[in-house]
């Protein structure tokens, strides 16, 4: 059989690649078709064709133990024959395609048409042209030369349209290039572990070749197809390819097929790589998706698939999963593997593509548009907060612009016809028709000009520039942004749910305490004090029952700490062995990994790991280690001082917990219990019956492992809290350990009112009798929850979802989450921003995340917040500037056209203004670097309008100044400067000095206003930090230089006439007035301008003092801020005291006995400090109609201050009691949705 297949296959091989005749014993096609089989089918095929997996290894000239020799020629040959492990990216759009796309802009198309008509008419000389009888409504005749110049305006409009298009296309092109760079960086970071020449090495995924022996472990995303050759308890989530959500158990004799793009959910093992790149299962799907190319894009569904499918431009195994995900979504059963998205959300998400106008140009290497991709992975976010607000604003402005331009055209046409045919009683002569048409075209161009200026085309540009700039800079701050909008969403974050290990701590585990042989050692015990039997068991238990890939290596530099490789907890235990002056290597070489009989790997359900070995006498021994409270429950014996097992009763266990484990945990140590159990050789136990096997253990020792808090974390958390962001810690550790670490980090402060819950208790509280999660139950818990311990990934997801869906606070919460494990995927996807760990994170977590923290450090998250807020501010600055220009230009063009029948600002000039104002200003204002002061204000949240009242004040204030001066110049300018008036000039008259001065002054005012626009919170010093931004200075000076050229040499095309020096001085002087005027505006207190409140505001339920605080605190400097805050606190206090006096009798009721007396000043301060605890005490502003209600309400409010008598140490049980007693009693008074809900936890 073997011979036949061999010869048969050689003939095929000759056909396929004659040059590589007998290189390897199987062809690419054979392996590819083998990988398409599943389960038993595949096992049968392997047996029939090859014999077994080892035979395939021999044919591929590789060793299951040693791997490939790893020589360059061999690897090269394999790449040539079997292909490289990378999928070619979709071709980037060419510059011409981008130009074509930029031309699709509607306003530009209208302008092009107008310009072409204008050009055509200027070359057409109708017979009645010289006819005196035709319209002379404009007064004054043209001389010959001028008539010739009619074409200039049309040509100039076309030219400026081309400029705008080229600039847009160039921006898109550079952004795409940058994005590809980012993508390739993500790829290079993607590494995988293989065995070459007997050494375990990590290589980039692209370097993997057929025949490699790869080591797979929990959390990996398989980068290629392969056959399982050895391992333990390996379970794979194949839903990305098959749509089946059950995990598939892999074994050599039942199902050895490992497929690229699938996730390792449990266990570890080795695989022989059999297909890479386009020949792997994921690669085949990609090729199918990419094949249809452009036609598919048109069809919505397929376009979506393709967008995601081609996300993998190269070897990036991680990106593959997204593709595979979407492929699964679209190809298999249309069901996303993350079933947590409810219908309403997915609707919101589907609209994303339509609304995400800013992201349009971003055709990234990640395939399709960014928004295409978002549509595809439905489980990704809804439209980002900023995009939503911008889209809304752009639509509103666009509508206003359309209306204005239509009115302008109608008025001009009516004015002309009435003036010509009614007032002057001119007859309509056929030969005059072309002349009239020319007038109408001119009016139409004026109308379009108004529209062009009204629509802020610069908005999407400003957003993309700002985001792209931030993303680039964030790389330096260790934030690798995968989804552009995550960067801006981060600025709005109100809550961060962070992992403990590795993010808040250094993830360098060391054993510092131990309990061995009935003695609790507060430091590493002296080896001689431990019984030799116990010592031997301990060394074996640690060395064998931990992943063999975990090692402690000598330090790289002299005097540095030893390097920890692999699982950090296991490294801590191995370090303990070394500290006991023992060595674990001999034990491992005696009992190599292949000889391990059975392994129960660690997972979030078991919370322990066990390994079974066969002893020389054929009996079995199982070593176990895991979280002490879990493993101790399974122990029935414990080793005493003499190394003999003694009975370990529940009573002893409780005592041990009290005396050993709790003190360790309160020092912030993780406690790990190491145990063992012996089994007889016959009858052999049923290894699949885990409950019986993992029981009746004998405890060897309990160790306390320290994972020190990163030194920079407490400061970072303080910054977050100051910035109004609540930090919560979600960890799998014991509650005492978690609380101790939370206090060290500054997440909780002793004496505060907060909750620390265990996963079980959390679940008990949020579920009703039927076991369903209720949002209002979550709402009672999350505002105070600071630590969630012993939590499963599901708890994390539930918490994140609960906070995001909560309508309990004024502003809907924006939540960021950090995660590193495979099972953090759902929480990372659900969060508004998901952070994955770059070093410790699994591929699966990185895939689900929006931002990768390349240094796993919490303080990098604070940097992300800073950048996010900066993006928001940059866009607000640009908006403030842009809208001022728009308001002024539209009003000038509109009134000018209506009064003088001609716009003082010509179409070409408007386009120039539009170009500099839009493109350059967006560049200048969008690249302001962030400052620490950004972290001194509260998050904007979801409902805050883009244009605050201060900005509105600035926009209108500057518009008034500019309009006043422009109209002054328009109507009395000729007298001021003693020049000819430019009003009512005939059709093709030469440019006048008068209108040139108006244009020049207009541009000068914009230039100086650009400096004003740098500050949007009412700061006085607009020059602050201006030299830190060279781009800004360059653009302002550059624009000024170009303006000089346009005015002095622009001539006809720009309708400019050269100006004298004194005229220039006046223009600049009026422009400088902007800066002075800016100071005047800053002096007007925003709080007085109540009428501005409506602008751009979405919802507003706050009461007045609070709103003052929110609005003004951001907009006045800090000294004033403290003063203002003091006043408001006083008002607040007085208000509250009034209410309390009114209802003082209510406090005597038994319900509230024993609780604290009315709040002290500090508790009022506490209310202020935590935005999410703010209570809407709007009662004082409401006429007292329903007394009873108010009394109860006020009474509750009275007690809402943290009662310090209770809950000092804040154990979960304590607060549990408070909660239950209260809820039962206050149930009567709280109707769902009332603010009282927020208080129940604190009573």
Swiss-Prot record:
Q: Which UniProt keywords apply?
A: ATP-binding, Calcium, Calcium transport, Calmodulin-binding, Cell membrane, Deafness, Disease variant, Ion transport, Magnesium, Membrane, Metal-binding, Non-syndromic deafness, Nucleotide-binding, Phosphoprotein, Synapse, Translocase, Transmembrane, Transmembrane helix, Transport
- Regions of biased composition (Polar residues) lie at 1-13
Bilayer-crossing residues are 95-115, 153-173, 391-410, 444-461, 876-895, 906-926, 947-969, 988-1009, 1029-1050, 1061-1082
Per the record, residues carrying Phosphothreonine are 1139, 1188
Q: Does the keyword Transmembrane apply?
A: yes
Which Cys pairs are S-S linked? none
Q: Which molecular-function annotations from GO does this UniProt entry contain? A: ATP binding; ATP hydrolysis activity; calcium ion binding; calmodulin binding; metal ion binding; P-type calcium transporter activity; P-type calcium transporter activity involved in regulation of postsynaptic cytosolic calcium ion concentration; PDZ domain binding
Instruction: From the UniProt record, report the name of the gene that encodes this protein.
Output: ATP2B2
| Catalytic activity annotation | Ca(2+)(in) + ATP + H2O = Ca(2+)(out) + ADP + phosphate + H(+)
| A UniProt-annotated Pfam family | Cation_ATPase_C
Q: What is the effect of changing residue 631 to M?
A: May exacerbate the severity of non-syndromic sensorineural hearing loss in patients with clinically relevant CDH23 variants; resulted in 50% decrease of the calcium ATPase activity
Broad class of the protein's primary localization: membrane
Residues on Cytoplasmic side: 1-94, 174-390, 462-875, 927-946, 1010-1028, 1083-1243
Binding residues for Mg(2+), per the UniProt record? 820, 824
| InterPro entries hit by this protein | ATP_Ca_trans_C, ATPase_P-typ_cation-transptr_C, ATPase_P-typ_cation-transptr_N, ATPase_P-typ_cyto_dom_N, ATPase_P-typ_P_site, ATPase_P-typ_TM_dom_sf, ATPase_P-typ_transduc_dom_A_sf, HAD-like_sf
Instruction: State the organism of origin.
Output: Homo sapiens (Human)
* Enzyme Commission number: 7.2.2.10
Q: What does this protein do?
A: ATP-driven Ca(2+) ion pump involved in the maintenance of basal intracellular Ca(2+) levels in specialized cells of cerebellar circuit and vestibular and cochlear systems. Uses ATP as an energy source to transport cytosolic Ca(2+) ions across the plasma membrane to the extracellular compartment. Has fast activation and Ca(2+) clearance rate suited to control fast neuronal Ca(2+) dynamics. At parallel fiber to Purkinje neuron synapse, mediates presynaptic Ca(2+) efflux in response to climbing fiber-induced Ca(2+) rise.
Query: Which residue ranges does the record annotate as region Calmodulin-binding subdomain B?
Result: 1141-1150
Quaternary data: Interacts with PDZD11.
The protein's name: Plasma membrane calcium-transporting ATPase 2
């Amino acid at each position: 059989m073997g011979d036949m297949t061999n010869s048969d296959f050689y003939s095929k091989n000759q056909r396929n690649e004659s040059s590589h005749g007998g290189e390897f014993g199987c062809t690419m096609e054979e392996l590819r078709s083998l990988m398409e089989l599943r389960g038993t089918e595949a096992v049968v095929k392997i047996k029939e064709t090859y014999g077994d997996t080892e035979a395939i290894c021999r044919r591929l000239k590789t060793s299951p133990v040693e791997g490939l020799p790893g020589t360059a020629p061999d690897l090269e040959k394999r790449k040539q024959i079997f292909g490289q492990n990378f999928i070619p990216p979709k071709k980037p759009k060419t510059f011409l395609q981008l130009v074509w796309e930029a031309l699709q802009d509607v306003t530009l198309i209208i302008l092009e048409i107008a310009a072409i008509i204008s050009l055509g008419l200027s070359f057409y000389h109708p017979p009645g042209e010289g006819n005196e009888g035709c319209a002379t409504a404009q007064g004054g005749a043209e001389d010959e030369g001028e008539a010739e110049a009619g074409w200039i305006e049309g040509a100039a409009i076309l030219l400026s349209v081309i400029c705008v298009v080229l600039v847009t296309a160039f921006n898109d092109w550079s952004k795409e290039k940058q994005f590809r760079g980012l993508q390739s960086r993500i790829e290079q970071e993607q590494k995988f572990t293989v065995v070459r020449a007997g050494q375990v090495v990590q290589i980039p995924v692209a370097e993997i070749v057929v025949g490699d022996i790869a080591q797979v472990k929990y959390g990996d995303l398989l980068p290629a197809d392969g056959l399982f050759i050895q391992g333990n308890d390996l379970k794979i989530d194949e839903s990305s390819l098959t749509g089946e959500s059950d995990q598939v158990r892999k074994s050599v004799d039942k199902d050895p097929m490992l497929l690229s793009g699938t996730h390792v959910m449990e266990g570890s093992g080795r695989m022989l790589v059999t297909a890479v790149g386009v020949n792997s299962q994921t690669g085949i799907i990609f090729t199918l998706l990419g094949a249809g190319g452009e036609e598919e894009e048109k069809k919505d569904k397929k376009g979506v698939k393709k967008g995601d499918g081609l996300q993998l431009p190269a070897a990036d195994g991680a990106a593959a999963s997204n593709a595979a995900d979407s492929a699964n979504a679209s190809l298999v059963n249309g069901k996303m593997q993350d079933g947590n998205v409810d219908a309403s959300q997915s609707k919101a998400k589907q609209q994303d593509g339509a609304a995400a106008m800013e992201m349009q140009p971003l055709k990234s290497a990640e395939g399709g548009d960014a928004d295409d991709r978002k549509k595809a992975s439905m489980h990704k976010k809804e439209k980002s907060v900023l995009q939503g607000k911008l889209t809304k604003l752009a639509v509103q402005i666009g509508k206003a612009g359309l209306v204005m331009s239509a009115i302008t055209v109608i008025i001009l046409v009516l004015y002309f016809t009435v003036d010509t045919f009614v007032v002057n009683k001119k007859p309509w002569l056929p030969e005059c028709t072309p002349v009239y048409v020319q007038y109408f075209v001119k009016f139409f161009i004026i109308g379009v000009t108004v529209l062009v200026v009204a629509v802020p085309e610069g908005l999407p540009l400003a957003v993309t520039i700002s985001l792209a700039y931030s993303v680039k800079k964030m790389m330096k701050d260790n934030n690798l942004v995968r989804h552009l909008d995550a960067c801006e969403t981060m600025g709005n974050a109100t809550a961060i749910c962070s992992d403990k290990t590795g993010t808040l701590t250094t993830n360098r585990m060391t054993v510092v305490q131990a309990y061995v042989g009935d003695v609790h050692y507060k430091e590493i015990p002296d080896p001689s004090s431990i019984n030799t039997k116990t010592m031997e068991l301990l060394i074996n238990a640690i060395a064998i029952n931990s992943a063999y890939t975990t090692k402690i290596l000598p330090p790289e530099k002299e005097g540095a700490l030893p390097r920890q490789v692999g699982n950090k907890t296991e490294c801590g235990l191995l370090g303990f062995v070394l500290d006991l002056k023992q060595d674990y290597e001999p034990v491992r070489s005696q009992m190599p990994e292949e000889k391990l009989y059975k392994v129960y790997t660690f997972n979030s359900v078991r919370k322990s790991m066990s390994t079974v070995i066969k002893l020389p006498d054929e009996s079995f021994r199982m070593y176990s280690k895991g979280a002490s409270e879990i493993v101790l429950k399974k122990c029935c014996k414990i080793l005493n001082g003499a190394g003999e097992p003694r009975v370990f009763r529940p009573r002893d266990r409780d005592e041990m917990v009290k005396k050993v484990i709790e003190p360790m945990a309160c020092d912030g140590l993780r406690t790990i219990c190491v145990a063992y159990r012996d089994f007889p050789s016959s009858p052999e136990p049923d290894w699949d019956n885990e409950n019986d096997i993992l029981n009746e253990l004998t405890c060897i020792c309990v160790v306390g492992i320290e994972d020190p808090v990163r030194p920079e974390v407490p400061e970072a958390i303080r910054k977050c809290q100051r910035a109004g962001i609540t930090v919560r810690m979600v960890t799998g550790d014991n509650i005492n350990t978690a609380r101790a670490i939370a206090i060290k980090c500054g997440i909780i402060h002793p004496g505060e009112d907060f909750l620390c819950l265990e996963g079980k208790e959390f679940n008990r509280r949020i579920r009703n009798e039927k076991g369903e999660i209720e949002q209002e139950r979550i709402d009672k818990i999350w505002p105070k929850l600071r630590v969630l311990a012993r939590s499963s990934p599901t708890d994390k997801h539930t918490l994140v979802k609960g906070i995001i869906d909560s309508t309990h606070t004024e502003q809907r919460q924006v939540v960021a989450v950090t995660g590193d494990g495979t099972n953090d995927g759902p929480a990372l996807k659900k969060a508004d921003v998901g952070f994955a760990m770059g070093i410790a994170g699994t591929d699966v977590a990185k895939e689900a995340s929006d931002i990768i923290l390349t240094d796993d450090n919490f303080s990098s998250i604070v940097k992300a917040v800073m950048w996010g807020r900066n993006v928001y501010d940059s866009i607000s600055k640009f908006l403030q500037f842009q809208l001022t220009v728009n308001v002024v230009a539209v009003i000038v063009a509109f009134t000018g056209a209506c009064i003088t029948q001609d716009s003082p600002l010509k179409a070409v000039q408007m386009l120039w203004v539009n170009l500099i104002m839009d493109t350059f200003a967006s560049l200048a204002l969008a690249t302001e670097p962030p400052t620490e002061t950004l972290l001194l204000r509260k998050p904007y949240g979801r409902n805050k309008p883009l244009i605050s009242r201060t900005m509105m004040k600035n926009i209108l204030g500057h518009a008034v100044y500019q309009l006043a001066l422009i109209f002054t110049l328009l109507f009395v300018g000729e007298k001021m400067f003693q020049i000819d008036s430019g009003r009512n000039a005939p059709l093709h008259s030469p440019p006048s000095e008068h209108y040139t001065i108006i244009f020049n002054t207009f541009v000068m005012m914009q230039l100086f206003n650009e400096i004003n626009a740098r500050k949007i919170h009412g700061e006085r010093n607009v020059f602050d930090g201006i030299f830190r931004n060279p781009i800004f200075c360059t653009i302002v000076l550059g624009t000024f230089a170009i303006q000089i050229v346009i005015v002095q040499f622009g001539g006809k095309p720009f309708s400019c006439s050269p100006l004298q020096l004194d005229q220039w001085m006046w223009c600049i002087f009026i422009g400088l007035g902007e800066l002075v005027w800016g100071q005047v505006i800053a002096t007007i207190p925003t709080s007085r301008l109540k009428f501005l409140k409506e602008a751009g505001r979405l919802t507003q339920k706050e009461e007045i003092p609070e709103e003052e605080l929110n609005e003004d605190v951001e907009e006045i400097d800090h000294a004033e801020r403290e003063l203002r805050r003091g006043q408001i606190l006083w008002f607040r206090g007085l208000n509250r005291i009034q209410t309390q006096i009114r209802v003082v009798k209510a406090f005597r009721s038994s319900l509230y006995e024993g609780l604290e007396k009315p709040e002290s000043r500090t508790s009022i301060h506490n209310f202020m400090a935590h935005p999410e605890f703010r209570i809407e005490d709007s009662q004082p502003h409401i006429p007292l109609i329903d007394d009873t209600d108010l009394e109860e309400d006020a009474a509750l409010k009275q007690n809402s201050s943290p009662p310090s008598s209770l809950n000092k140490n804040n154990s979960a049980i304590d607060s549990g009691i408070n909660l239950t007693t209260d809820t039962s009693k206050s149930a009567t008074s709280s109707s769902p949705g009332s603010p009282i809900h927020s208080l129940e936890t604190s009573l």
